[in-house]
């Protein structure tokens, strides 16, 4: 039985990366440095733009984060692909929260737009995931739209984020 809380701490997210949060067969979040959130502040089975589920998570920004030292030297900015990956991470986390089993894999995204950036002077990134559909057949898949905000300002949007849970990834 999945412990379905409305929020999760950094320690909980790290437990997920070790396969301890959603059980031995549940999906895992990546470990640091690829874990792109510090906490999940809200998870619901309803709500969001489509009333089919909503997740909100946060990442605290500080100038010592690993990507600022290499992307780019003299012009530090968080890579946009990390924000996109964070949204995929949260779709997979939600599928585990619903009780889904398997290994999470990003399956695609319909459209991504970047209209801002995350600099080392920022304080907080907020991720918002609005679920459109959950497929729970042979393949468990989540379809959602996502938003990334920095210090309350919308900077990325993604439409039709897709993540699937697979029992066997050898042929993937």
From Swiss-Prot:
GO BP annotations, alphabetical order: unsaturated fatty acid biosynthetic process
UniProt subcellular location: Cytoplasm
UniProt key word RNA-binding: no
* Molecular function per GO: (3R)-hydroxyacyl-[acyl-carrier-protein] dehydratase activity; trans-2-decenoyl-acyl-carrier-protein isomerase activity
EC id: 4.2.1.59, 5.3.3.14
Which catalytic reaction applies to this protein?
a (3R)-hydroxyacyl-[ACP] = a (2E)-enoyl-[ACP] + H2O; (3R)-hydroxydecanoyl-[ACP] = (2E)-decenoyl-[ACP] + H2O; (2E)-decenoyl-[ACP] = (3Z)-decenoyl-[ACP]
Q: Where is the active site?
A: 71
The record's InterPro entries line, in alphabetical order, gives: FabA (IPR010083), FabA_FabZ (IPR013114), HotDog_dom_sf (IPR029069)
Q: Which GO terms describe its cellular component?
A: cytoplasm
- Keyword Kinase tagged: no
Pathway membership of this protein?
Lipid metabolism; fatty acid biosynthesis
Q: Please give the subunit comment from the record.
A: Homodimer.
Q: What does this protein do?
A: Necessary for the introduction of cis unsaturation into fatty acids. Catalyzes the dehydration of (3R)-3-hydroxydecanoyl-ACP to E-(2)-decenoyl-ACP and then its isomerization to Z-(3)-decenoyl-ACP. Can catalyze the dehydratase reaction for beta-hydroxyacyl-ACPs with saturated chain lengths up to 16:0, being most active on intermediate chain length.
- What protein family does this chain belong to? Belongs to the thioester dehydratase family. FabA subfamily.
State what protein this is by name: 3-hydroxydecanoyl-[acyl-carrier-protein] dehydratase
Coding gene? fabA
């Amino acid at each position: 039985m999945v412990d379905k809380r409305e929020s999760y701490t950094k320690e909980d997210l790290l437990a997920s990366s070790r396969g301890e949060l959603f059980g031995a067969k549940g999906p895992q979040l990546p470990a640091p440095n690829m874990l792109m959130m510090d906490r999940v502040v809200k998870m619901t089975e309803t709500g969001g733009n489509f009333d089919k589920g909503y997740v909100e998570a946060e990442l605290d920004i500080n100038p010592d984060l690993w990507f600022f030292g290499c992307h780019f030297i003299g012009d530090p900015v968080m890579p946009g692909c990390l924000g996109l990956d964070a949204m995929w991470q949260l779709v997979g986390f939600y599928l585990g929260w619903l009780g889904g089993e398997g290994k999470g894999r990003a399956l695609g995204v319909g459209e991504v737009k970047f209209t801002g950036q995350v600099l080392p002077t920022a304080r907080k990134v907020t991720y918002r995931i609005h679920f459109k559909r959950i497929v729970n057949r042979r393949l468990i898949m989540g379809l959602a739209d996502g938003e990334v905000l920095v210090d309350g300002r919308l900077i990325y949007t993604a439409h039709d984020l897709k993540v699937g849970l697979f029992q066997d990834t050898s042929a993937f």
